[in-house]
């Protein structure tokens, strides 16, 4: 797997090789960042279900000043740490928490929140509710889910701006 664009373009990162983690493939990751690129002004990015960290690392490569990576799986988090170390990313924080526990203890505001939970977690509104207060006033949420998942067109003051499918994956983007 490689970084698509930005200061770390073409650099290779390690994948997790875990059955419980679905990596966002290069093509899809590139399409997502092409979708949100015109609106992307990121100081701080949260990847709540980080896996290998590819999505947050891509944000860093494209200008994010600080990334926060969380994954419940310790092995996945070790891959995140290794990838950041290999790429020389020092402005990163790592957490090994259930997403609800992370949200309860975090008080930062994020310009970009990336959500790619296991597809069996199909209560999209509940996940949006849990991260809502972490989103900055002009922030954006990128939510990857199974193609069959139901999601709201609007959520509180968030507006659905993109809805694309890639094979068995759906990507929706909410903006505040």
Each language-model region and where it sits:
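Class I S-adenosyl-L-methionine-dependent methyltransferase catalytic core
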Residues: 1-176
């Amino acid at each position: 797997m490689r970084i698509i664009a930005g200061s770390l373009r073409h650099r290779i990162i390690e994948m997790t090789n875990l059955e419980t983690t679905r990596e966002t493939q290069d093509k899809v990751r590139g399409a997502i960042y092409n979708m949100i690129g015109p609106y992307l002004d990121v100081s701080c990015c949260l990847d709540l279900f980080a896996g290998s960290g590819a999505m947050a690392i891509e944000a860093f490569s494209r200008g994010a000043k600080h990334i926060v990576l969380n994954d419940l799986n310790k092995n996945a988090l070790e891959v995140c740490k290794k990838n950041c170390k290999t790429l020389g990313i020092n402005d990163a924080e790592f957490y090994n928490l259930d997403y609800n526990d992370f949200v309860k203890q975090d008080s930062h505001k994020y310009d970009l929140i990336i959500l790619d939970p296991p597809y069996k977690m199909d209560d999209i509104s509940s996940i949006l509710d849990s991260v809502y207060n972490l989103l900055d006033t002009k922030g954006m949420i990128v939510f990857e889910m199974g193609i069959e998942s139901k999601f709201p067109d609007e959520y509180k003051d968030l507006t659905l701006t993109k809805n694309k499918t890639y094979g068995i994956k759906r990507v929706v983007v909410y903006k505040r």
